[in-house]
From Swiss-Prot:
It is found in: Plastid, Chloroplast thylakoid membrane. The chain crosses the membrane at residues 8-28, 41-61. The gene is psbZ. It is a multi-pass membrane protein. SUPFAM superfamilies: PsbZ-like (SSF161055). GO terms for cellular component: chloroplast thylakoid membrane; photosystem II reaction center. It comes from Coffea arabica. This is Photosystem II reaction center protein Z. Pfam families: Ycf9 (PF01737). Its main location: plastid. PSII is composed of 1 copy each of membrane proteins PsbA, PsbB, PsbC, PsbD, PsbE, PsbF, PsbH, PsbI, PsbJ, PsbK, PsbL, PsbM, PsbT, PsbY, PsbZ, Psb30/Ycf12, at least 3 peripheral proteins of the oxygen-evolving complex and a large number of cofactors. It forms dimeric complexes. Keywords: Chloroplast, Membrane, Photosynthesis, Photosystem II, Plastid, Reaction center, Thylakoid, Transmembrane, Transmembrane helix. HAMAP family: PSII_PsbZ. Belongs to the PsbZ family. GO terms for biological process: photosynthesis; photosystem II stabilization.
Length: 62
């Protein structure tokens, strides 16, 4: 169970880092938002899901 928690935390940190870099780049590009809207929404949905997963796993571990 601890390994699953550690992997979920790592995935959350990796997703946060990717979104931290990619979202401003998409907004700064001339046609970025209209062409990459689905990718940003998918990444944000993944991030929200990982936040809940880490919270659930944390409550099971401690």
């Amino acid at each position: 169970m601890t390994l699953a928690f550690q992997l979920a935390v790592f995935a959350l940190i990796a997703t946060s880092s990717i979104l931290l870099i990619s979202v401003p780049v998409v907004f700064a590009s001339p046609d970025g938002w209209s062409s990459n809207k689905n990718v940003i929404f998918s990444g944000t949905s993944l991030w929200i899901g990982l936040v809940f997963l880490v919270g659930i796993l944390n409550s099971l571990i401690s």
